[in-house]
Amino acid sequence: MALTWNSIISAEKKKAYYQSMSEKIDAQRSLGKSIFPKEEHIFTAFDLTPFHDVKVVILGQDPYHGEGQAHGLSFSVLPGVKIPPSLRNMYKELAEDIPGFTIPEHGYLKTWAEQGVLLLNTVLTVEEAKAHSHAKFGWETFTDAIIKKINDDMEGVIFLLWGAHAQKKGANIDTSRHFILQAPHPSPLSAHRGFFGCKHFSQTNELLRKQNLSEINWGAVTSS
């Protein structure tokens, strides 16, 4: 039977760590706390990028914790929401790296996901206005399992690991089967230390070309 995200996620949901985590999150919701993203958006990355379509993984940390920002894709925000600083810096690098790239007026990265870019956060929920509030709830175990499945069952996937957190998360990726591109995080705190000029977007397309796979059209960032 072909592997699907549905079968992979269903197997994780049966495990004790996941059930314990769900109880913690449900308890917070029942106390009236705002948890982002909305429940129906937690697994958006998997909905938009089927397992066997994954070509690239861009690993984020935890969801944006402001109202209306997080919608289940790392670094992305819904149309109409102000572009966050890290994504703005990603756009700046794209404008330097990819000929003809025009910086969009929104931060909605759905079209990347639909082309095979898994926009995966390490932690998939957060409490409003409390960064990293759901770290250690169990999401790290879940996303380790996701990365392991890609590592074990796919070949030639390109992992973009920006910053120490992502690089540590990707430490067990088999580089004889996959590709890793590392740079500092695009955050304003670190982008000038080597994210700008890393050329990861063009390098990704070069690696895809060498595998006879279609390139990512990074410039196809539409707001619908």
From Swiss-Prot:
Gene3D superfamilies: Uracil-DNA glycosylase-like domain. Keywords: Cytoplasm, DNA damage, DNA repair, Hydrolase. It catalyses: Hydrolyzes single-stranded DNA or mismatched double-stranded DNA and polynucleotides, releasing free uracil. One of its GO terms (cellular component) is cytoplasm. Pfam families: UDG. GO terms for biological process: base-excision repair, AP site formation via deaminated base removal. Its main location: cytoplasm. Excises uracil residues from the DNA which can arise as a result of misincorporation of dUMP residues by DNA polymerase or due to deamination of cytosine. HAMAP family: UDG (MF_00148). Belongs to the uracil-DNA glycosylase (UDG) superfamily. UNG family. This is Uracil-DNA glycosylase.
